[in-house]
Amino acid sequence: MAALRWLSAVVAVSTTVLAITPEQMLSAPRRGEAIPNPSGNVALFSASQYSFDTKEKSSSWNLLNLKTGDITLLTDDANVSEIVWLGGDDTSLLYINGTNAEIPGGVELWVSSVKDFSKGYKAASLGASFSGLKAVRTRSGDIKFAVNAQSYANGTAYNEELATKYASTARIYDSIYVRHWDTYLTTTFNAVFAGTLKKGKHQYASAGPLKNLVAPVKNAESPYPPFGDSTDYDVSPDGKWVAFKSKAPDVPRANYTTAYIYLAPHDGSSTATPINGPDSPGTPEGVQGDANYPVFSPDSRHLAYFQMAHKSYESDRRVLYVYTLGSKTTTPAVAGDWNRSPDSAKWLDNKHLILGSEDHARVRLFGPVPIDADDDFKPQNFTDGGAVSSYHVLPDKTVLVTGTAIWTSWNVYTASPKKGVIKTIASANKIDPGLAGLGPEDISEFYYDGNWTKIQSWIIYPENFDSSKKYPLFFYIHGGPQSATPDSWSTRWNAKVFADQGYVVVAPNPTGSTGFGQELTDAIANNWGGAPYEDLVKAWEYVDKNLPYVDTENGVAAGASYGGFMINWIQGSDLGRKFKALVCHDGTFVADAKISTEELWFIEHDFNGTFWGARDNYRRWDPSAPERILQFSTPQLVIHSDQDYRLPVAEGLAMFNVLQERGVPSRFLNFPDENHWVLKQENSLVWHQQMLGWLNRYSGIEEANPDAVSLDDTIIPVVNYNP
């Protein structure tokens, strides 16, 4: 019953402010989105929790009363992987059972009820590991659903347990990608499958085999890896259509971001066709970039989606388009000049949408946005701080929001365009003992003059912060580079965990950051070590001059991905001498090694050309330049994992080699089973012990605070053959 431990915390929680440790954060419950029932009085959500004592993870599905905030357990059966409301009433459910009694490697669809979940029944047997369940109940009472799985070219779903095993482990490629994110490509690919559950007198039953809607389109794939999920496709409310996103199959996938939104009959009676392809009548002129998030209107007459204009720039501005099914005219942009890049949408009604977008280091909701809004229409925000992760429109047209913030891992509330935030229903810092005492007072922000414009930065305070005292600086640099440090919870780079070691964390959003207008985002192109570095220098100078409670003499700095590149760049720069220690996680080091990445469009955009045609651009910001290496002197921890194919592990090894040969105190931390991110809890705990232990040793935190994380907390032996 470990999964239920946190449920009792709903009743009462200590008001004592506690420092949050890495172990507390990693073992705290991780909750999913709150999904409301048709009446909007109860919501479903998933939860999982890892125990460092038992080394096991428990999972559950729960019900949240949207009026009282009370939480009750629905099921703690680990085989229940996904649940959706069946529709037609407020209690019926459809879920995926992650096992199959008849087919090894398959799953099952079950129908049940919140009244007595254990008395459900099997409605369909599926012959592979399907996931991403979406379902609508049609007027006939039948259920039209879509799921996704790996597929063979012939349309058959791939089942790993039943697949042919070759005697050789060889891989052979005639095209790129060879590998992507953390996976070597094979001849199988992701595909969306459609199916029907027929309504019988007493039960639903499968109407026949699933239809593969993607395989008939050569080289199409949906959801698109590595981050594609069920938001890459949608089922129309009338059950007649499925829309899905795929990278454009007619251009080299490693060189272009171009994507199409395809429309297919749910019954698979004809091949899917793109609504925004090069030969589609509705395609807007000059719009050739990534497209995503297709979502049908309630009346099934319109399909909203986002698309970028640039065909090889993954961080171009997204623009909302609304396609009318059956239309042969150009699909109009909606609020086309809005200087934000929305990435989610929900229909408020048949004529208006709610949009989610990054905005000034938050993720906020905007609307209502009319589908016929002119280019100069400016959507209005109606949520506050934090980061919205999902949302659903309720019957009364209020919006049920699930989000996070730097101070809470789960925050459920209602909001509306007219009233703004209405009511907080549940928040992790009020439920979980390990997060007790965290609140919005733990953070603040400031703006300062950067290299060429105003730059925003977060401040995160430690437990029992006292402005009359001094705390070492923890300077955090985000990755991307076209990304941001938002007001959101993270289990990888949790600023509050860092602060509670005894630091004041400062996290700037320099040139290249998203959510502050496209000009700031675009300005990092061919400028990696230029304006962003100067922005960071000026952030440090601002802190040194204006925040008397920050001890910059004993400050430390850390960054990941592009932030890791910047740590390596700082190591060879004057700013590097301002820090007692540095941590580089998965950062680039050798300029010429960038060609070993997988998404070539990224480097070719950010360095204004190909590796052979613009080599000087690649080398302009080279942390491994000899004159920079000669400046290396600040102790540095290098972290790099074997399954990182975005920035291969050789980059971390190269940096560590140079640091060691230069006699700079240094350590290399490697995980053979992690990618660009460290996700497994046991590995993440070691990551925190080593990262914080390294910084604490050189900042003085370890000596001043006996409870601080230490390098010695890790039981993994250190390999050291130095004479």
From Swiss-Prot:
<dbReference type="Pfam" id="PF00326">
    <property type="entry name" value="Peptidase_S9"/>
</dbReference>
<keyword id="KW-0325">Glycoprotein</keyword>
<feature type="glycosylation site" description="N-linked (GlcNAc...) asparagine">
    <location>
        <position position="608"/>
    </location>
</feature>
<feature type="glycosylation site" description="N-linked (GlcNAc...) asparagine">
    <location>
        <position position="154"/>
    </location>
</feature>
<protein>
    <recommendedName>
        <fullName>Probable dipeptidyl-peptidase 5</fullName>
        <ecNumber>3.4.14.-</ecNumber>
    </recommendedName>
</protein>
<feature type="glycosylation site" description="N-linked (GlcNAc...) asparagine">
    <location>
        <position position="97"/>
    </location>
</feature>
<keyword id="KW-0964">Secreted</keyword>
<dbReference type="InterPro" id="IPR001375">
    <property type="entry name" value="Peptidase_S9_cat"/>
</dbReference>
<comment type="function">
    <text>Extracellular dipeptidyl-peptidase which removes N-terminal dipeptides sequentially from polypeptides having unsubstituted N-termini.</text>
</comment>
<feature type="glycosylation site" description="N-linked (GlcNAc...) asparagine">
    <location>
        <position position="451"/>
    </location>
</feature>
<dbReference type="InterPro" id="IPR011042">
    <property type="entry name" value="6-blade_b-propeller_TolB-like"/>
</dbReference>
<feature type="active site" description="Charge relay system">
    <location>
        <position position="561"/>
    </location>
</feature>
<feature type="signal peptide">
    <location>
        <begin position="1"/>
        <end position="19"/>
    </location>
</feature>
<dbReference type="GO" id="GO:0006508">
    <property type="term" value="P:proteolysis"/>
</dbReference>
<comment type="similarity">
    <text>Belongs to the peptidase S9C family.</text>
</comment>
<feature type="active site" description="Charge relay system">
    <location>
        <position position="676"/>
    </location>
</feature>
<keyword id="KW-0732">Signal</keyword>
<feature type="glycosylation site" description="N-linked (GlcNAc...) asparagine">
    <location>
        <position position="79"/>
    </location>
</feature>
<keyword id="KW-0645">Protease</keyword>
<keyword id="KW-0378">Hydrolase</keyword>
<keyword id="KW-0720">Serine protease</keyword>
<keyword id="KW-0031">Aminopeptidase</keyword>
<dbReference type="GO" id="GO:0004177">
    <property type="term" value="F:aminopeptidase activity"/>
</dbReference>
<dbReference type="GO" id="GO:0004252">
    <property type="term" value="F:serine-type endopeptidase activity"/>
</dbReference>
<feature type="active site" description="Charge relay system">
    <location>
        <position position="644"/>
    </location>
</feature>
<dbReference type="InterPro" id="IPR029058">
    <property type="entry name" value="AB_hydrolase_fold"/>
</dbReference>
<feature type="glycosylation site" description="N-linked (GlcNAc...) asparagine">
    <location>
        <position position="255"/>
    </location>
</feature>
<feature type="glycosylation site" description="N-linked (GlcNAc...) asparagine">
    <location>
        <position position="381"/>
    </location>
</feature>
<dbReference type="GO" id="GO:0005576">
    <property type="term" value="C:extracellular region"/>
</dbReference>
